Amino acid sequence: MRRPMTLFKRISSPALLALALFGGAAHAALVPPQGYYQGIEKLKTGDGNFRCEAAPQPYTGPLQFRSKYEGSDKARATLNAASEKAFRKSTEDITTLEKGVSKMVGQYMRDGRPAQLDCTLTWLGTWARAGALLSTDYNHTGKSMRKWALGSMSGSWLRLKFSNSQPLAAHQAEADLIEKWLTRLAEQTVRDWSDLPLEKINNHSYWAAWSVMATAVATDRRDLFDWAVKEYKVGANQVDDQGFLPNEIKRQQRALAYHNYALPPLAMIASFAQANGVDLRAENNFALQRLGEGVLAGARDPSHFKARAGKKQDMTDLKVDSKYSWLEPWCALYHCVGDTLERKHDMQPFNSFRLGGDVTRVYDPSAESKK
């Protein structure tokens, strides 16, 4: 019996040394991009007329919602006004939570008023205690709302969690409660969006992966991080040589708009992966760069999208500056210059509640001060 033990001791010492040297790097705590460490911009005195509204009613029911494209053909590109109104009404409390948390975190990181932080924690804590949004009775629109809300909340939470001002230090019990809930939502989101056939993987899967990535970093869950990276790679490998996503081309007149909509989650995931030593920029021959360049070109001249999708493009969304919030992480990844950089500067600052709020303050804070 002793001989194997001696052999083990002899070979294990270098192995243990290697583990000590490299194992730590492999399991280092997950971190966000550098901009999330920013402290409170300028501490203000007084309440600034801030009033904490009552938290929206936690949504604990079945996640069964009507789609705004109800009755549309397989392109899912024609809005149904009646079903969209019903969708907005039934998801109103969820959207109020998303937008409210994003706004209050932004206010707090700007002004540092304790009431702003307390109100944010009250809202999130109320929903966490209720176990909101965790129903396993859902349809496609329902599971979509779950991952959108998770991305909004975890995206905002990261700004509090990693800020050099350490706003959560005095609220650890509440923070733990909220993070446990976010983790449960992320775990359910993984179940919701795993193992889909390729023809079903589109922007929804990318947004799901962003929500899981944001939560992974907020809660230091390497398994969730790995899942988000895996989903990113699937998405990147869907981008063809011309920079098109075949499953978004199916949206016909809204193909360009949906290519643009696919970019924010993909760019954020790649940015967060890079912060943790995983470089996804070159995946599928620089697919993310190709996708972004194609959308920017299409916004100027949509004829290539019209030719590929077979329909004249609906440019409504492409005229809204905030729809290009992906430019912040994308330009941080690919170092935009010239015309692209100029376009980004013209449209700043970018604020997207689904990405956790003020994206420009995170990625290009000096630009915000110029506005």
From Swiss-Prot:
The keyword Metal-binding does not apply. InterPro entries: Alginate_lyase (IPR022859), Alginate_lyase_dom (IPR008397), Chondroitin_lyas (IPR008929). Disulfide bonds: none annotated. Substrate binds at S67, K68, H140, T141, Y258. One of its GO terms (biological process) is alginic acid catabolic process. Its main location: periplasm. GO terms for molecular function: poly(beta-D-mannuronate) lyase activity. Its EC number is 4.2.2.3. Gene3D superfamilies: Chondroitin AC/alginate lyase. It holds the Pfam family Alginate_lyase. It is found in: Periplasm. Keywords: Lyase, Periplasm, Signal. It is an enzyme of class 4 (lyase). NCBIfam families: PRK00325.1-2 (NF001467), PRK00325.1-5 (NF001470). Belongs to the polysaccharide lyase 5 family. Catalyzes the depolymerization of alginate by cleaving the beta-1,4 glycosidic bond between two adjacent sugar residues via a beta-elimination mechanism. May serve to degrade mislocalized alginate that is trapped in the periplasmic space. This is Alginate lyase. It comes from Pseudomonas putida (strain ATCC 47054 / DSM 6125 / CFBP 8728 / NCIMB 11950 / KT2440). The gene is algL.
